Design a protein with these regions (language model features):
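Basic, amphipathic alpha-helical segments enriched in Lys/Arg and hydrophobic/aromatic residues
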Residues: 207-262
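Intrinsic-disorder/low-complexity, polar/charged segments
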Residues: 54, 68-74, 146-153, 217-221
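Short alpha-helical patches at protein termini and domain edges
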Residues: 7, 84, 99-103, 107, ...
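Acidic/histidine-rich, metal-coordinating catalytic segments
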Residues: 30, 90-100, 120
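Switch/connector loops and helix/strand junctions flanking conserved nucleotide-binding motifs
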Residues: 35-37, 100-104, 124-128
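RNase H-like nuclease fold core
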Residues: 2-92, 199-200
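Extended amphipathic alpha-helical interaction segments
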Residues: 106-203, 210-215, 227-228, 233-236
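Amphipathic, well-packed alpha-helical segments that form the structural scaffold of globular domains
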Residues: 79-80, 204, 208
Length: 262
């Protein structure tokens, strides 16, 4: 309330139409599988929630999209719509193996670098891990990406493989974690930015729990916006303490000297 005038509060769907910043350091593409009703049929569909971190370290919900695997131009249209909202560059895109998204992201933002998505990898391990151990597993996966040095990573990775040593886990490790060491060309501070997963896991779980894949369905994306809750959970907060952010920014300036971060 301002001077007796009641102020309108933006809804989640309205926030996803606002003007964007020119640059996002990282955009997390968080995938959930939900049921969507089309006519008389209910089919499973992948939903991607895009969350960006701006150059000041603030997280912003960008939008929610329903993947269209048979439309090779769909993601290009999505990225072009983001550019129309003011977005000019994405430094890192944390995404699963969605080939259409990666291909078209490179067209829209030629300098983008793709990184693993922990919110995609962790649930693949959850399927074959007891419920009480899933949180511990998520922490260990995060640790694989955020060791101080490549030598520390190798030690951590060896221990991870020893602990998760059944045939299924070994197959998952080979398929999804075999290239993790390559990310150690980036400093630990930048990797903390790329794989700061706690807030992303919260969003992933919020959609997963709200739309149980065996019990619920939606008719359109507006129902997802409604379930996401308050905009305060997705806008205007930092995921990093001041010292953490200073170290991240210091390393980004060295990696991207032509970008004005400050």
């Amino acid at each position: 309330m301002l001077g007796g005038i009641k102020m309108n509060v933006l809804t989640m769907s309205e926030c996803c139409k606002r003007k964007l910043d020119e640059t996002y350091l990282v955009v997390y593409a968080i995938k959930n599988e939900i049921n969507i009703k089309k006519g008389d049929y209910i089919e499973k569909s992948d939903i991607y929630t895009l969350v960006g971190v701006d150059i000041k370290g603030y997280r912003q919900l960008i939008n929610v999209y329903q993947d269209k695997v048979n439309n090779s131009r769909y993601w290009l249209e999505c990225f072009e719509s983001l550019k129309a909202r003011g977005l000019k560059s994405i430094l890192f895109l944390s995404v699963d193996d969605n080939k259409n998204m990666k291909r078209t992201a490179k067209i829209a933002f030629p300098g983008v670098v793709f990184t693993d998505s922990i919110t995609d990898i962790a649930p693949k391990f959850y399927k074959y891990t007891s419920e009480k151990d899933s949180k511990k597993l998520a922490g260990k996966l995060h640790d694989l990406y955020t060791q101080k040095t490549a030598t520390d990573f190798k030690t951590s990775f060896d221990n991870f493989k020893k602990e998760y040593n059944n045939v299924i886990h070994q197959k998952l490790i080979e398929k999804y974690l075999s290239n993790t060491e390559g990310l150690y060309k980036y400093s630990v501070n930048i990797r903390q930015l790329l794989f700061k997963h706690s807030a992303n896991i919260y969003l992933y779980d919020r959609i997963r729990i709200s739309f149980n894949e065996n019990k619920n369905y939606v008719k359109d994306l507006n129902e997802i916006y409604e379930k996401l809750g308050s905009i305060d959970d997705y806008f205007g907060f930092k995921s990093f303490k001041k010292r953490e952010w200073t170290l991240i920014l210091n390393d980004l300036i060295q990696l991207y000297p032509n970008i004005d971060f400050i």
